[in-house]
From Swiss-Prot, chains A, B, C:
Source species: Caulobacter vibrioides (strain ATCC 19089 / CIP 103742 / CB 15) (Caulobacter crescentus)
Keywords, in A-Z order: Isomerase
UniProt-recorded Gene Ontology molecular function terms: glucuronate isomerase activity
InterPro entries according to UniProt: Metal_Hydrolase, Uronate_isomerase
EC assignment: 5.3.1.12
Protein name per Swiss-Prot or TrEMBL: Uronate isomerase
UniProt family annotation: Belongs to the metallo-dependent hydrolases superfamily. Uronate isomerase family.
Amino acid sequence: MARPLSFHEDRLFPSDPATRSYARGLYALVKDLPIISPHGHTDPSWFATNAPFQDATDLLLAPDHYLFRMLYSQGVSLDALKVRSKAGVPDTDPREAWRVFASHFYLFRGTPSWVWLNHVFSQVFGFTEFLEASNADDYFDRITAALATDAFRPRALFDRFNIETLATTEGPHESLQHHAAIRESGWGGHVITAYRPDAVIDFEDERSPRAFERFAETSGQDVYSWKSYLEAHRLRRQAFIDAGATSSDHGHPTAATADLSDVEAEALFNSLVKGDVTPEKAELFRAQMLTEMAKMSLDDGLVMQIHPGSHRNHNVGLLNSHGRDKGADIPMRTEYVDALKPLLTRLGNDPRLSIILFTLDETTYSRELAPLAGHYPVLKLGPSWWFHDSPEGMMRFREQVTETAGFYNTVGFNDDTRAFLSIPARHDVARRVDSAFLARMVAEHRMDLVEAEELIVDLTYNLPKKAYKLDQRPDWARPATLRAAAE
Amino acid sequence: MARPLSFHEDRLFPSDPATRSYARGLYALVKDLPIISPHGHTDPSWFATNAPFQDATDLLLAPDHYLFRMLYSQGVSLDALKVRSKAGVPDTDPREAWRVFASHFYLFRGTPSWVWLNHVFSQVFGFTEFLEASNADDYFDRITAALATDAFRPRALFDRFNIETLATTEGPHESLQHHAAIRESGWGGHVITAYRPDAVIDFEDERSPRAFERFAETSGQDVYSWKSYLEAHRLRRQAFIDAGATSSDHGHPTAATADLSDVEAEALFNSLVKGDVTPEKAELFRAQMLTEMAKMSLDDGLVMQIHPGSHRNHNVGLLNSHGRDKGADIPMRTEYVDALKPLLTRLGNDPRLSIILFTLDETTYSRELAPLAGHYPVLKLGPSWWFHDSPEGMMRFREQVTETAGFYNTVGFNDDTRAFLSIPARHDVARRVDSAFLARMVAEHRMDLVEAEELIVDLTYNLPKKAYKLDQRPDWARPATLRAAAE
Amino acid sequence: MARPLSFHEDRLFPSDPATRSYARGLYALVKDLPIISPHGHTDPSWFATNAPFQDATDLLLAPDHYLFRMLYSQGVSLDALKVRSKAGVPDTDPREAWRVFASHFYLFRGTPSWVWLNHVFSQVFGFTEFLEASNADDYFDRITAALATDAFRPRALFDRFNIETLATTEGPHESLQHHAAIRESGWGGHVITAYRPDAVIDFEDERSPRAFERFAETSGQDVYSWKSYLEAHRLRRQAFIDAGATSSDHGHPTAATADLSDVEAEALFNSLVKGDVTPEKAELFRAQMLTEMAKMSLDDGLVMQIHPGSHRNHNVGLLNSHGRDKGADIPMRTEYVDALKPLLTRLGNDPRLSIILFTLDETTYSRELAPLAGHYPVLKLGPSWWFHDSPEGMMRFREQVTETAGFYNTVGFNDDTRAFLSIPARHDVARRVDSAFLARMVAEHRMDLVEAEELIVDLTYNLPKKAYKLDQRPDWARPATLRAAAE
């Protein structure tokens, strides 16, 4: 007999009764607000085709590196979890994979995955017992059965989750066919894209040659020549904007920027295109391209997102056997003050530009990022990110950033996820942690309750809409209520 | 109708009733103790001339980079706030500037400025409504009217604020005329100076040539020759000591120290004086001068303060248009263990020397500073500084420093401010946060209440007096009570 | 009349009543569990000879650098505390030294030493008044008298402290005679060793030449030839395993690892042995030897412990007068992601290897260590260490590590101490802080109480036994209950 899954309505609120009471009141103001998800990695084909998801392992376990990295760290093989390797998807029985997961679920105690998964299990699927070995089959069967119903198809879940806007991420070398299909389908869900050009900027990425080929096709430009390479970016940015994009997204190893002359930049590009790639030149080119992207933003208005500091695919053995993105990305020490100076010297006071900074190095919150964002008009701070998208991580972000940057140089929450079913859970955690933080401010008389009430709504809804320029829906997008009424 | 300004008597105390009760009791022991302000940047001419302050904008807004940097970060122009540029003070109507400030006051939610300003508004000026757009004019008028009265002249406020000692900061190239005037005025307020020689030590500072010229005048020495350059320092240090100084103050980019031979040091100086300035040589000279200053302290007893780690005037556009110190100083990663070793190897065990270290890089609290101060007899730790002079920042300082360095290797609070009216507010915050920290220690049975009671008085009053050698007033300085009786 | 020493049963528990109640309940489950001490620095001769300890100063003060570093930082001379210098033990009256300590005991307020010492005073010696100048003699006399009794001999205390396993640390060049004596004595206390080869790996350590000589003797190998140097390690590791060792221990300046070819490694070793020592070559050799040790672990199963980041003996004057290990070790910024990559690329996925990482740089908890341990099967995280072995330090460890690495990639508590009497105090603090952390999780509904109950037992007892492979006692070791029955 498994333990009852009591997913408490006061979860994540401080235990002190006065503070908890304020937290409850603040959370009540925002718990039913629509979800703004301006930065994430869901698959647009889900919403284009609206095909049902397959089974519990295929949807929840095998693609989620948060989950399989933890199990891998404890000696569980990725094959046993049905995680795709370079040889393809292992032929592990998905039910067996789910059993392995269930019997190791205790590993997630104290992690945000515990909160997210139990939210999904209880709120999305209606389970009332904690997952464990004894009920693994019941979980697997009931989830798989639910997924076969219309109520669990992607669009139905999108509506049920009360998502107002959902951004995916694509590269300039990728087609936007699924976004076109969504737009033309008449469904009306506001699914947009974001412009992530890393693969055609990073000459050290082994995927770069193929991405350049496809970039030439999608843009119709000679992308091996500097001026038309830039023109290709301009054209694709516009195509992304036509597909709803309001932001670009840049995941570089460091925050380095540069401000080369046109002649220098062209010479650097030519050298790299010819295959003369050194780490220094690749880094300088990435740095220069952040400034080039910023210059394009002056004209087309895309908000820039910069999130540096991950050592990608650190586990060489796993990269060789399983390829990229298998939970082996490790944060590195990151520097912003010198790194951003060339770009900021060029454009830091330009009212047409908006840059959202992220970090995996929490030491920069109070030392670098809050002082920068609390001064430069072009800078804002993205929420605590990736490993730090967690109750303690979010609280540290607020505690270390707010006193210098205030709340209004931050941009609300990003779920940044490809785990579609966890989106409501992640936003719920953010709303609860922000409520808890503000509740403490009120309980300690550092803020008036009226101010906290305004702030919780701003942090949840108004700031992300404003920061990501999502204030207006395009004609083809309609609120879920209208979609529901139309059905 | 604006919201009532309820500035609660329990502000900044933890909400848990037991802890709050201890905090109240501890705070009650120190809330009326005199203010010791051993490190700050108020203008000594205020106390020398005792001329009235001008208006709300001129006193509270335009000179305060904490305030205008936040508004600037949100797109408000400095001209609209009447902040001086290189072209002079903008002719903005001060009332209009105040209105802009009032309508953006919500930006300061969650920041220490919110606490400080509401303290000033309610406790110094008696306002009972929160500042907002609707009452901006009322605020402006009442503040400006109050400032015209004798009760709001600098000396009257000094007495009302119960300041026992206030240190300003001057350079060796600057006159101490205002301090002389204060001393000779018969007023009796204990306003002293501190010796800050950065401008005649940092050959990379563009103000350095003019400072050297004036240093030659104030010292009567050939400051372009190494031996008389050092003699000029010795003479000016003594003049500062005669004007009450008990400390020197060193704001270098890094904490680097050096221990060159006399021959090496002289050669380095000669090279720099001849204009052969490279970043490496300028850095080495700053490093060597910290050791030279320490050697002079052995003889004259000045306490050294070292606070490295700020990238000054990071915003190049703003530096060009508005000059230095416009809220664009950004902290950098800072290293102490290797940097201080030359000086500590030379003098680290000398009982005649006392060095107070500050940081803008909070990661050094537990890793470097507390271990250093918990071992070396010459080292003590200054309070959380600048961006970290805030409730969360102060609490992090105590939490991260105390377990290794204890309380008695710290030196109490520094307000470090040029915002004279905020001095009581800042000291009040420090007293409250220390009370809250000690209250938690007591509530968690990690300290006896008797010990906490001794400590709160030590942290507030005894430690700063001892660390800054302020145990004795000079003959010309008299307590406020005597000054009041004399009037 | 000194204050009563009220060492409260709720110490270190949060004040919030609901949280405290959970903390009490969790702590009750583990407070009487046996102590597993898999990493420490007690002297095995104590347990081999079972000779009585001498007096309060000799046992508690003079050898404890946590204590005398704090007093030294406040100007107390080491001679006054009877701390051994290069000239020998000062002839200070031990009672006088104890009086100096007592009159400065207030310096330890807020530090873990305060908690540990008051635990020892009240729980081990039965004092009921806080130590202060007025009762210094009473403390000295009563402690010294107690130490002369059989109940305070090392083995009796070992039993009374309910220690199940205690590991000491020896070098490969050192004899294991005391461990042999313990094993053969019939006493049955499970005192084991750990393999710490730093002195024969670090060519920059001035003790290295003498250590190599002794290494040749203990191993019977030509340790100046690469292949037999490695063989000497293999032989000594096996001898340590025979003396109960389950782990090796590596205290390097950095976490650097290398993976040289055999030819490169041999050439490097030959060059160093010939005396051609540069910092770069010494560092590379240390780096390579971590990989060599890991390779040997594949065969012999020793768990590797790596704890980098201390600048040893920073105070040059004190090193000259008093020698090493006098409280002047200062942590440095430490990097793991690049540093460990060579070793992890070679062996990071090998199920035969287990590495426990420690740090003195808390910034690496959430940025580097938790992400590494939350992915690599060979990595686990040691507890907060040295300066961070403290209530706040332990809490930061849990708060910053758990969300990414979970609990099961950590290994429970290490006391890491040579202060034998403080071992129960230190483990008690860890149990209380873990109880407090878990209590908050439960009170905030982030974990089920049943899970927290399982976890507190795992963190206290099961994880260290498993991580250090202490699941089985050897034949010669018997539980304290059996030893007691036998007497």
